[in-house]
Design a protein with these regions (language model features):
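N-terminal small-residue-enriched
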Residues: 1-405
Length: 405
């Protein structure tokens, strides 16, 4: 396994290089990864790829407090020295109306994540595994003729955050992913498709059989399709589709979007009802199901579980250091690192409010009523949504999207 960086040694080097440049205040965020991936087409290798990536961001504050930023992929002394000098020079053009600072939680304890590191497999063994998965999926139904989109990948990644006030964060992670998307065709009918994804900490731990089963069942279930009449229907979203929709409107919870005036929410929205009174929504980047969980964000703030909605009432926004300072609260661990620090969610948890009785009635009332689609009271199950980038108007609260179901 490839040797990792030594964050303490790197911070010591940066301190020395910054001092030689006359720089007192700086920070660095680094993300490095080694990736291997394969794709197949009817049993033949379609693509076999390996890549090493490094993205290092350096910020420098000058004597007037303005910030300059630069990017590099060179962690040698010469590369870091050039990055520091470049960021220092750029700070002369920093925006005096938007000056980020160090997160006050950049040195606070972080959660200990149980993320076992796995050895990488050879690219040929990945190819054999994906070929077998494709073969099994094609054999599930005569109508399944191709698996046009597929991939098996593994990654070893490393994240670092350092600053001149002593912050020293480092995280190592290995992950693997499998993606299968089948296409079925029958004479005289439109092609139907469905897919499935599986994630794990290593390629040997992937639930390959489960991925094949889900992709096959979804594709086969879509074969017997029929049009529905125009009308009003009760729609039931699959968990994945509902999370996609929540994510498309996540600007409602984003403090950066609120400050920029591109959110449905306002500063005064905290405490207002946004949803039905039995809905709870949390952002929990530390959820055990989050294979790619990060213990800290781009500013070094620890990741934590944050309540967004309680009983349908807005309780919190997602914050970076700058937005938290503007709102007079603590950073929440949702910042990226860049010329303008971004804010984004990690892992949504959706559930009924405890004690509300929400979700207990279920959908059995529709089965008992004997209602049929087209009568204006039918039930439509939505498995997946498409074209969210084009069909969602997040700042207006509207959407029009194609779906499978």
């Amino acid at each position: 396994m490839q040797a990792s960086l030594d964050a303490e040694v790197l911070r010591s080097r940066l301190e020395s290089l910054a001092a030689s440049e006359g720089i007192e205040r700086w920070d660095l965020g680094a993300a490095c990864s080694t990736d291997t991936s394969v794709q197949v087409d009817r049993g033949e290798a379609k693509q076999m790829k390996g890549a090493q990536r490094s993205a290092i961001t350096v910020r420098v504050w000058n004597e007037r407090g303005l910030v300059g930023i630069t990017s590099t992929s060179d962690l040698s002394d010469d590369g870091l020295s050039r990055a520091l000098a470049g960021a220092h020079a750029a700070s002369a053009f920093g925006n005096p109306d938007d000056i980020p600072a160090f997160s006050p939680l950049a040195t606070a304890p972080v959660a200990e994540l149980q993320q076992p590191l796995h050895e990488s497999r050879t690219i040929l063994s990945l190819l054999d595994t994906l070929r077998q998965a494709e073969r099994e999926l094609l054999g599930r139904h005569p109508a399944i003729q191709t698996v046009p989109y597929n991939g098996l990948a593994q990654r070893r990644s490393e994240r670092i955050y350092l600053n001149s006030e002593g912050a020293c964060r480092q995280q190592l992670l290995t992950t693997a992913s499998l993606y299968l998307y089948a296409r079925a065709e029958e004479a005289g009918r439109k092609p139907r498709s469905s897919g499935a994804v599986r994630l794990a900490y290593g390629a040997n731990d992937l639930d390959i059989a489960g991925c094949i089963d889900e992709a096959a069942e979804g594709t086969i279930s879509h074969l017997n399709y029929a049009p529905i009449s125009t009308g009003r229907y009760t729609c039931v979203f699959s968990p994945e589709a509902f999370l996609d929709l929540i994510g498309a409107f996540s600007g409602m919870f984003n403090a950066r979007a609120v400050l920029d005036g591109v959110s449905l929410s306002r500063r005064e929205s905290l405490g207002e009802a946004l949803a039905v009174p039995f809905l709870d929504l949390h952002d929990n980047g530390l959820h055990p199901g989050n294979i790619g969980a990060s213990a800290f964000d781009g500013e070094g703030t620890p990741t934590r579980r944050l309540s967004l909605l309680e009983g349908g009432v807005l309780r919190s926004f997602l914050h970076s250091e700058a937005t938290a300072r503007a709102f007079g609260v603590a950073p929440t661990g949702h910042a990226g690192l860049g010329a303008k620090v971004s804010v984004g969610p990690d892992w949504f948890e959706v559930g009924p409010t405890p004690g509300s009785g929400g979700g207990e009635t279920g959908l059995y009332r529709f089965a008992a009523s004997g209602q049929r689609s087209g009568e204006g009271q039918g039930l439509v199950v939505i498995d997946s949504l498409s074209a969210l980038h084009a069909g969602v108007k997040a700042s207006q609260g509207s959407f029009s999207l194609p779906f499978d179901g």
